[in-house]
Amino acid sequence: MNDNFIERAFSLAEEGVGQVSPRPSVGAVIIKDNKLISEGKTEPQPGNHAEVNAINACNEDITNSTLICTLEPHSYHGVSAPCTEAIIKSGIKKVICPIEDPNPKVSGNGFRQLKLAGIEIERNFSPQHIKRAKNIIEGFKKSLVHKIPFISLKIASSIDGKTSTNSNQSKWITSEKSREHGRLLRSKYDAVMTGINTIESDNPQLTFRDKNGNNTGYPRYKIVLDSNGKINEKAKIFDSNETTIIFTTKKNKINFKKNNLEIIEVEKVDGRTNLIEIMKIINNLGIHKILVE
């Protein structure tokens, strides 16, 4: 199989990371006579899965073609009908896929259904491809198995471990290229999280802007930990349309209202918001990957 086809499937899946949770992001391409004849990627709920989009987008005879997808096709009726049904009906003869879906409702059953229908399954991928496929769904799997989001911490520090000068007057200790990468990271997470001290000192917007400076709408959620309800209603975090979630404690009310603002009160533990409770709440909201800044 041409590695370019596999690369295209992975690229499609990676494009959707941070945009389709609580679904896992999947990429799919359809090959016939060594030519790519269609492709698709996962849509946010209630849209289609990648495999169905690839089948629907195909304008050529799909019979006896090969489907490459980055995650096992799902095999049960949920928000969407099973992808396995669409694949079987389409006339696709072979499915190439690196990993099983960790969802217990699937977990190999998708492959079994396809095999029973006479469709050949190939899973002969390199360790690098398998690792890449698993990385794409790391948030989905973390949520599924541990019931909490996958969390990454972004921190800028000097070689001796400092993040600013003693006076806190320093603005940047990173290069423009590094800051650009940090902004790009935001687009690959469902939410960016920070504390009230960062809001007060830096007054960030916590958005991802394109090369022209336009807001992209990602990440879809901005989360602030504000134990004492100190956030200013004029903070820049409220300047864009993404949903902002503020976690505060039940004794500290935030009295103002804004569009796309959700205030969630939790119990206080050791004088702060209860992080364990917060992570469970966030996971239940369908937020599977968080970038902490």
Residue ranges and their predicted role:
Residues T66-Y76:
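Active-site cofactor/substrate anionic-group-binding motifs, chiefly glycine-
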Residues A28-I31:
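A short, well-structured edge-of-sheet supersecondary motif
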Residues S21-V26, T63-T66:
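Acidic, glycine-enriched active-site microenvironments
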Residues N48-I68:
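Flexible, acidic active-site loops/lids enriched in D/E/S/T/G that coordinate Mg2+ and/or position polar
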Residues E51, E72, E293:
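Acidic-residue sensor for enzyme active/binding pockets
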Residues M1-V20, D33-L36, E43, H77-E293:
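Zinc-dependent deaminase
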